[in-house]
Structures are given as structure tokens and as C-alpha cells.
UniProtKB/Swiss-Prot annotation:
It comes from the Bacteria. It comes from Teredinibacter turnerae (strain ATCC 39867 / T7901). Pathway: Porphyrin-containing compound metabolism; protoheme biosynthesis; protoheme from protoporphyrin-IX: step 1/1. It catalyses: heme b + 2 H(+) = protoporphyrin IX + Fe(2+). The gene is hemH. This is Ferrochelatase. NCBIfam families: hemH. One of its GO terms (biological process) is heme biosynthetic process.
Length: 366
């Protein structure tokens, strides 16, 4: 195997990198852009655990000939002048976090963001970080609840890139923060602010992205962590079990997924006497297609068409100050024990001199 070379210099000041990773987005709201994005996403065996040959036939023979056009129409509804909402919010989160960390560590800590699927790719962003002298890397997948299909897949991509590199950084990886006190407090404050401006509804629905039920039976902790987040958030808001409902959205295919399904639930609630609902998606660190269009529009119609009277979506934390507080504390907690002080200029010069004088140094470049 040909390993990637590292542009290393003894005179370069070693830095620490913080990499925020989210799921991904197409380059444009068009069928042409959606096809390669969906192919990369749905080809991931972590996302679709199905016999590979059979799935390849289904994906390439049916799905990629039908779904890109349909998905493009949905993306077009949420696209902005700056691009995809998910990319915008993730970039803003990284920028705000970088400002916070610059105040603490000057330029010793570098913050970047990447997407698991699409652009900017993890491999490209990691290369950029290493080119800047990053020798310690903290990776934070922006999924509060762990699932093999999201956080696990992020680690797969990280590992695949590392397998091609000659030199590897010191590595730390945040695999979940579903019960992080700051995260729960930020969610609770977002709900309280909404209540202050809009009053309370009959029910607060906490909708998470669904996964097939068999993932739970195979040991994936996602379902348990979603329920834990809901319980802690309800406690923070002093709500009873009857006032909060946890549900799961965005199911794909015909097999059974985690229930109750959000869309089915919203069709049924008006018949049970629930005329007003407020819905939040705690598993989404940023608003995106699944929250803006699916929850904000599509599921609103289901509720109102079946007799509901008042439907309100509570936005994600996005790049709000309280969310940046959470991310900053996650970083500080996970950087403990690593050296973050800049290396003295004199020490760097001495390192370079020793390297230059080493008899085994043929190139004199290290």
C-alpha cells in the first residue's frame, strides 16, 4: 500500500485540532447532485445493514433512478442563498467554537468541520488540519445519541483515512453526549423560550431520527439513549410522563423501525383529543431537511388535516450561544491531559538543528 506522506518539519509548532462532523448534504438541490450523494450515503453498510449484492441491485437498479428527483424537490424547499441549512449551521458552529477556543489557546487549537457524506469530506479536512501542524486530534460527531449508523460510521471513515496515512496523530473521539448536563440544559432553555413566546401546547413531542428495530435487538444503544435524553429533558422542564411523547421519524423501507412513528402519531393525536402540539428534535444538532421540511411542513399537514388546530416546531440548537457553550465544554473536558501550550521558538530551532546535524538524515528536510 502507498501511504500518504506527511509534510512534517521539526521547526513547525505542533497544534491540536478539533473536528466537528455531521452527516452530510448534497452540493446542490438537483437530481444530478443528489445521485452521487445518495449513492455514497446509502452504500454505507453501517446505514443499510442488508446483504451487499442484493442491496447493490436495489440501490442501483431502483432507488438511484427514482429517489434523486424526489429528494431534490424536498431540498429545493429548504435551500438558501448560503446553501444547505445543515452545512450553514455546522459551519457557523465551527466558526463560533473557534472564536471561543482562540480566546483560550490563541492559535494552538484549530477548529474545522466536515461531513461524513458529501463535501467537505472528512479526509480532505483532516489533511488540511495535518498540513497546519495538528498532531493531536479531537473528533466530535454532532450526534448526541450514539448509533452505529451515524457515530459508528463516522469512526469508520476516520479509520479508513488513517489506514492510508504513514503518520497518525494522537486521537480522541466523543461517541455520545446524550445525557450531558449542558446539552440537556440548553434543550430545556430552548423549550422555555418557546413557551414564553408562544404559550404551552397540549403535548410536547420529542422526535428522533428512526432506525430499524433490529438494530436495537442487535445491541445498538441509540433507542435507550434517546429515551434517556427525553426523560432528562422532561425532568428539567418539570413535565410529567403524560405531557411528553417520544417518537421516531424518517423511516425508510418496509421493515419495522423504532416506534411510535412520528407521522403516524401526529395523524392519531387529534382523534384522541390532542388539538395542539409542540415538537422538538433533540437528536439533531442543526436544523436540516428532516427538521425543516419533514417535521416543520410535512408532519404539520398530517396533524392539521386530521383535526389538529395548533402545531409548532421548536428549532434545533444550531449555532446558538447555549449550544456553543455545550460544544466548548465538551472540547475542554476531552482535551484534558494534552499539552496545549506552544513550543518555545528556541526549542523549535534546536530541534531543527539536531535534525539537520543527524548523520542519518539524508534529505535534511526533517
Amino acid at each position: 500500500m502507498q501511504y500518504k506522506s506527511q509534510n512534517f518539519s521539526h521547526s513547525q509548532n505542533p497544534k491540536t485540532g478539533v473536528l466537528l462532523v455531521n452527516l452530510g448534504t448534497p452540493a446542490a438541490p438537483t437530481a444530478k447532485a443528489l445521485k452521487p450523494y445518495l449513492k455514497q450515503f446509502l452504500s454505507d453498510p453501517r446505514v443499510v445493514e442488508f446483504p451487499r449484492l442484493l442491496w447493490w441491485l436495489i440501490l442501483n437498479g431502483i432507488i438511484l433512478n427514482v429517489r434523486p428527483r424526489k429528494s431534490a424537490a424536498a431540498y429545493a424547499k429548504v435551500w438558501t442563498e448560503r446553501g444547505s441549512p445543515l452545512a450553514i449551521h455546522t459551519a457557523d458552529q465551527a466558526s463560533a467554537l473557534n472564536v471561543r477556543l482562540q480566546r483560550r489557546f490563541d492559535d494552538q487549537v484549530v477548529v474545522a468541520w466536515a461531513m461524513r457524506y458529501g463535501s467537505p469530506s472528512m479526509a480532505d479536512v483532516q489533511q488540511s488540519l495535518f498540513d497546519q501542524g495538528v498532531q493531536q486530534l479531537l473528533v466530535i460527531p454532532l450526534y448526541p445519541q450514539y448509533s452505529a449508523a451515524t457515530t459508528g460510521s463516522t469512526f469508520d471513515a476516520l479509520s479508513a483515512d488513517f489506514q492510508r496515512r504513514r503518520w497518525l496523530p494522537a486521537l480522541r473521539f466523543v461517541n455520545q453526549y446524550h445525557d450531558n448536563p449542558g446539552y440537556i440544559a440548553a434543550l430545556a432553555e430552548r423549550v422555555r423560550q418557546h413557551w414564553q413566546n408562544n404559550g404551552r401546547a397540549d403535548k410536547l413531542i420529542l422526535s428522533y431520527h428512526g432506525v430499524p428495530l433490529r438494530y436495537l435487538h442487535a445491541g445498538d444503544p441509540y433507542h435507550c439513549q434517546c429515551l434517556a435524553t427525553s426523560r432528562l429533558l422532561a425532568e428539567a422542564l418539570q413535565l410529567t410522563e403524560s405531557e411528553v411523547i417520544t417518537s421516531f421519524q424518517s423511516r425508510f423501507g418496509r421493515e419495522e423501525w423504532l416506534q411510535p412513528y412520528t407521522d403516524v402519531l401526529l395523524k392519531q393525536l387529534p382523534g384522541a383529543g390532542v388539538k395542539s402540539v409542540q415538537i422538538m428534535c433533540p437528536g439533531f444538532s442543526s436544523d436540516c431537511l428532516e427538521t425543516i421540511e419533514e417535521i416543520g411542513e410535512e408532519n404539520r399537514e398530517y396533524f392539521l388535516q386530521n383535526g389538529g388546530e395548533n402545531y409548532q416546531y421548536i428549532p434545533a440548537l444550531n449555532a446558538g450561544e447555549d449550544h456553543i457553550d455545550v460544544l466548548e465544554q465538551l472540547v475542554l473536558d476531552n482535551l484534558q491531559g494534552w499539552s496545549l501550550a506552544p513550543t518555545a521558538k528556541r526549542e523549535l530551532e534546536q530541534r531543527q538543528q539536531r535534525a539537520d546535524s543527524c548523520p542519518f538524515n539524508q534529505t535534511k528536510k526533517l
